[in-house]
UniProtKB/Swiss-Prot annotation:
Family designation: Belongs to the iron-sulfur cluster assembly SufBD family.
GO biological process terms on file: iron-sulfur cluster assembly
UniProt name for this protein: Iron-sulfur cluster assembly SufBD family protein MTH_1150
InterPro entries: Fe-S_cluster_assembly_SufBD, SUF_FeS_clus_asmbl_SufBD_core, SUF_FeS_clus_asmbl_SufBD_sf
Amino acid sequence: MLRDTLKKAEKAREKKALYGEDIDLEKFIKEEAGEHEEVTRAKEVPKEVQETLLRVGVDPEERERAGTFIQVDQSGICTTCASESIEIMGMNVALDKYSWLKDYMWKAVAVDTDKYTATTALREAEGEMGGYFIRSKPGAREVFPLQACMFIGDERVMQTAHNIVIAEENSELHIITGCATGEDVSSALHVGVSEFYLKKGARITFTMVHNWAEQVEVRPRTGIMVGDDATYINNYILTSPVKSIQSYPTAYCTGENSRVVFQSILGGQKDSVLDMGSRVILEGRGSSAEMVSRAVSKDSSQIYSRGHLAGRVPEVKGHLECHGLVLSDDSMIYAVPELEGSATELEMSHEAAVGKIAEEEVMYLTSRGLTEEEAASMIVRGFLSMDITGLPPELAAETKRMLDMSLKGM
């Protein structure tokens, strides 16, 4: 099996991605694992790193957190776990501990998807395994979230990570992931492969905040397998400048009455190119999906907002919604909603709208004493501050705090 995987990866080494600008991987440094010193607690990382972690929802003090994983460049430097109902560890550790884990690798994401997945697999074969393993035990319902951070601290580094998350039957798991760069980093590449497996009756909420440097390129590759009566909720926030990001996670609702929700908040600034979307394949009877995105473009940014709902069996439901605000003549939002139905008795719909700030709203706020700039900023923040559904009250409040912090620059 490993040999077949590596053969596929080798053949796809130069394979361009379907979407997004092609990246020359040779211009980045392939740093070895173990280059950074390990710490026993998150609060032991340098002060300037702690401040960056807070901006992406990762608390160095680990207050109300069930566990923590931090990867700097290619090195897993911190792993803690405060709960007996879940497991969190580096993938290199998990593969040594569990021989069965390799059976989950490259099942939700094909290794030959493109050059980025292929490069991740080839680096793994060379011993440069990055990423985390998270598992909730059967019946476990952890109240506090786990937190994970992918941090790039060195210039021109290529960071690869292969994450696997397993929610066993009737378990519930909440994860906050923050991705960021150090203050001295201007350019780098992050490639994150993430595979989620939700067993019968399981539930995962996954909230991700990105805060990259202006010349960082980002290529996440994500697949989600959703079993009977399972629910996966994904919240994504990006409002800081980045050179380019291209992400198109795909969820497979193979289980009966399975459910998937994708909610994205995108703020394009400066020369950023954001090619974002999500795809849900509804293959189990009674399965459903909801995909909602809010996008704002300013300066000379470009946003491609994609969504694809595919109903393959009867009695499935799906809704796709994309709303965008264009704030400058040099910026652009390109909405691409797709509905695909290949069975009877299904319900799928989409709603897309791209426009500008309403002048009457600005006039109303300026009449109340705000400047035009303050009024526009308030309207934008209100537009992007959509309600994040599906979270426990404590985590919903934490997510709102993370969102408010992200929107300060908009």
